[in-house]
């Protein structure tokens, strides 16, 4: 079931940190302690979810958050998806694909014409998920939703019916 995180309540940060454990472990070296990292993440999330055109979406199964992503409307009807990740213990069960499909339905219901994501060419599971959801690799410059170039990444795009991917 798709859930939108609309406020950072007790337990929200812990649930997301647990889900994003591998990414968080990589980020930890940039902070003086795991607690400092979690505090910074809580501050980021608290600000992020207050914006109408920014969302944290999670796929929940039997009360457990199994997959999550963030999305940002970078231009009217154009949404940037990032931080798609599935909890290690939930991988290989199709939860990321289900989350992507639910996200496509939610955002097209709000008038989205294009969704895009930047994917490392080495991240074959993410590429497979994106392709299975109708995203295609483009030749477009790998610019994220905030207008920052991310060299080495591939921009994958999905468009609603009648809007060709370029």
What are these regions (language model features)?
Residues 107-119:
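Conserved GNAT acetyl-CoA-binding A-motif
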Residues 86, 92-105, 128-132:
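Conserved acetyl-CoA-binding loop-helix of GNAT-fold acetyltransferases
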Residues 60-62, 157-160:
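Active-site beta-strand termini and strand-to-loop segments that position acidic
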Residues 1-18:
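A short beta-loop-alpha structural element at the N-terminal edge
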Residues 118-119, 131, 136-153:
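Conserved catalytic-core motifs of GNAT/GCN5-like acyltransferases
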Residues 89-90, 145:
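PDZ/PDZ-like domain micro-motif
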Residues 7, 18-83, 87-88, 100-101:
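Acetyl-CoA-dependent GNAT
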